[in-house]
Amino acid sequence: MTLLERYQQILGALLAELQAAYGARLVACAVFGSVGRGTPRYGSDVDLLLVVGGLPRGRFNRVEEFLPVEAHLESVLTVGETGYPPIALSPVFKTPEEVEAGSPLFLDMVEDARILYDPQGFLKTYFDLLRARLRQLGARRIRRGNAWYWELKPDLKPGEVFTLLPTRAWLEAIS
């Protein structure tokens, strides 16, 4: 089994556990970072965006709700073929409302994330609209060695204010 196949196996098992744990509350799930780009290395963690309705307030409460998922996956995450290190999950938890409010984290996701689960198209629509807005602004991701940054509006004038995506406007686009 190749490293990429191992990550694919983990993602399949993970999605099944997420659906079992969150049920109808699971709105969407995406993998980002090196695994989302399809370029994991030995020891790469699995960066996840979990969009779940009715999440408890606070990161610790959200992690506590996620712990059974991780526990059920322990054998898949730790038992690999010889030479494969254990794999860590790094979830980011958002409610649909928090996704609508936006986050700088989503900038890279429009290019690098792979949506694993999104039955209503919520996350795909959000990413599509954000991607379109970035294009409209002329935004670009500028690479410097192994790092990058975003130039969101190259023609920005001093004192000018702009929005990436109005909080509720994108909802109207999918209605």
What are these regions (language model features)?
Residues 1-27, 37, 42, 100-175:
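The feature captures the alpha-helical scaffold/lid subdomain characteristic of nucleotidyltransferase
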Residues 31-32:
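Hydrophobic/anchoring residues in structured secondary elements
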Residues 44, 49, 61-63, 69, ...:
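Residue-level signature of transmembrane alpha-helix interfaces in integral membrane proteins
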Residues 44-46, 86-89, 112-113:
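Short glycine-/polar-rich loops that comprise or flank the Walker A/P-loop
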Residues 38-56:
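Conserved N-terminal glycine/acidic-rich loop preference
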Residues 1-21, 50-100, 106:
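Metal-dependent nucleotidyltransferase catalytic core
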